[in-house]
Amino acid sequence: MIANNIQDALIQPEAEINAAPTKISGITRKITTYLRWLGSILIILSAVSFMLQGNAEILPAYRYWIGLGLTLLLCAGGLICAYLFHETKGARIFFGLGAAFLSVQVSQVAAMIYAYVQGTNASQPDYSWLQFSQVSPALIGIDLVITGLLLFLVSYASYSILARKHLKTLLWTSVIANALLILPIRDENIVPFIIAGLYFFIRKTECFLHNDASMRLAEGVAARAIISLPLWIMIGRSLLHPASFLLAVVISVILVIYCIYDLKRYTRSTFILYIAQWIGTLSAIAIWIAILAEFVSPRHLGFSSFLPIAVILFALSTQVDYHARLYRFISTLITLGLCYFALTEQQAMAPVVSIAVGILLTIAGIKYREKAPFIGGNICVAAGFLFYWEYAINLYTSAPWISSIALGLAVILLASYIENREKKIIAKSRIYFNELKSWH
């Protein structure tokens, strides 16, 4: 009932404003926009300052209640804008900030529960202002109930005014994300899987919401950003504890997906996409380097260990917006170098891998009409077959007369083939080289 009244109060003034005969001038609109931005920034900075400054002497329970009071104050500001001023923009901002601050409240309750459950075994951050120990179970229970109630009411009101069409989806996603955030788990081998699962769950919801044009407006983007806050809080909280291999890999995967794939949905800025592309590329390479450092001893590292880097660059070349040819060129050079060292050191399966990789590079060169992968692929294929030249020599020395007869027959047949199809061979050779010249 309370949530429905809030929702009606927030939606009703919009119709009244649309029916009003007066029009807001452009200058006034700009001034009010700047003022709203300024006020929002001041509120956020004030809350961050309270959490980061020298407030270690404040008991954890009091710190939670101060944060709760700030959340309620923001909701009160939203009600004032809706009921008293009959204005919805300010109400959206206030309730949006209130819903965002609730994730901070959830994280504080989660810290209390974790400290109580784990006791002296709790892995506390080095910063005293992030430690929430020595809180009574009764108070933790009260905080949990209050937080859960406000999470539903404030989120309901916030998403109703920001994106009423997708209210159920946003509310359901927010509840699940915050429920995972409150779990009293800090194990370095479990938390990365929780982060990965939550990320893909939110990403799936985000892709669904992005398909709706109304969710690309400022209100829709704000609602989508709010539901992802628990994920970023969980990642930031995990970075305050001892790092682990799994966490590094999960964060790197998230960076790759976001920078290479997802960011294109939000902006077309050349500068932002360019920087994000290199961040994503370096993150993808870092994943493989982390795997090598974790599972492979430096003494057992071979040149073949770096072949996946060439594969990563080639795969990313199909997704990046800039320097795709450069990615494929570098990948080709790495592949050529690795095949050369593998063949010269006579590693097992080196010729087979060289031929297989060469065929793939040749096909890629034909597909993208690029000389570097095409020529590099031909070299790899030729090098792979030449590796077996030793067996041909051994065969010749063991039975020279058989090899000589076979070679003589092949030479005569080749001469006859060239003589009968001389013009076709010359014409096709010209077409081949002219086509190759036109490639990049």
Predicted feature locations:
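Alpha-helical multi-pass membrane segments and their bilayer interfacial helix-loop junctions
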Residues: 1-440
